Curated annotation (Swiss-Prot):
Sorted UniProt keywords: ATP-binding, NAD, Nucleotide-binding, Nucleotidyltransferase, Pyridine nucleotide biosynthesis, Transferase
Protein name as it appears in the record: Probable nicotinate-nucleotide adenylyltransferase
Gene giving rise to this polypeptide: nadD
Protein role: Catalyzes the reversible adenylation of nicotinate mononucleotide (NaMN) to nicotinic acid adenine dinucleotide (NaAD).
Matching Pfam families: CTP_transf_like
Biological or metabolic pathway of the protein: Cofactor biosynthesis; NAD(+) biosynthesis; deamido-NAD(+) from nicotinate D-ribonucleotide: step 1/1
Keyword Transferase: yes
GO molecular function annotation: ATP binding; nicotinate-nucleotide adenylyltransferase activity
Reaction(s) the record says it catalyses: nicotinate beta-D-ribonucleotide + ATP + H(+) = deamido-NAD(+) + diphosphate
Major enzyme class: transferase
The UniProt record lists the keyword Isomerase: no
Amino acid sequence: MRTGIFGGSFDPPHNGHLAMCLFARELLRLDRLIVSVSRNPFKTGAHASDDDRVSMARLLTDEVNAAGRFAESSSWELETDGPSYTVDLLRHIADLYPDDELLLLVGEDSYRQMGQWKAASEIPRLCQIVYFGREGYENCQHDAEALHLPVRRIDFDMPVSATEIRRLVAAGQPVSQLVPPSINHYIAEHGLYRS
């Protein structure tokens, strides 16, 4: 089986995440997608609680699965002590699914920081790296390129960010065009991101 791993803080999950999951399913012919909620060692603090982020990731996988069961959410990274590192998640998933071909799905920003990741040179031995590149970044030097990490780039440009969504919610602005309906409802119902 081909298993995609898509990690992130999902604070909150948005339409860009949803589109990336669906796009990856078709383009990469994935059999399974694991959406892993993490603590990003390069970001300072989450804005929603771990429980809220896990709940919203489950809602994201429900949206992805509307066309058939494919995605599952994981809170394994949050359940471990200390910082969360991609290489540890990959080792864990490789132990769970030893016969699967693993594909790590990352966005442009994460890909650009890959050279700073713990055990970055080990990652290609555990999985194929697929990054979703944004227009305008193609000529930039990346840490991952400097390490000669083998990657597959997929052009994908969906200009929506969790930072902007949090800012809009805090300002009392609607975000219904930026997040799936179930996540929009969850944010409102739980009063997330209000200042």
